[in-house]
Amino acid sequence: AQSAGISIPTLCHHEKLEPFGGCRLCIVEVESRGWTKLVVSCVYPVEEKLVVRTRSEKVDRIRKTILELLLAHAPDSPELKRFAQDYDADKDRYEKDASFCIHCGLCVRYCAEVKKADAIGFVDRGIRKEISFIPEIAARACNDCKECFPLCPTSYLQAAFVLTEALAFPSAPSDNGPAK
């Protein structure tokens, strides 16, 4: 769509990564073989005679709701604020959840697909799903890398790394007593 000049919002897309569909903002309405349905465009296969509506009352309403839900997790994200303005989304519609992570997966996927480090991963499922650094790997791989940090649309990753580093990456004890 982008190569054809069609703008579809997304928070989880990166040119170096495989499509993921995690943010759901790229939702579109497709019509094929007499059926109409909403799909995540970045992972939906193109087929002959497929009709795609990137903007409609229904698509815009769903995107607005998705943005309002994401804003409950990351109300100060500049990217979310920009999209919220485009779709007239209310950042106060849902009760705030102080997690700040919107589970776009950019950090997890970049670390795995580009860096081949697997130092970050998804932990748990459903409403308990989180992004977490794998201490044994992150202690070695992340200190000199941090290439995933600027990809995070909410800045959650930087805060999570600082906390993880403080709690889980202690200096190795020396022969002269405990590490300082």
Predicted regions and their residues:
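A basic, amphipathic helix-loop patch mediating RNA/tRNA/ribosome contacts
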Residues: 2-31
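Fe-S ferredoxin-like electron-transfer domains
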Residues: 24, 32-180
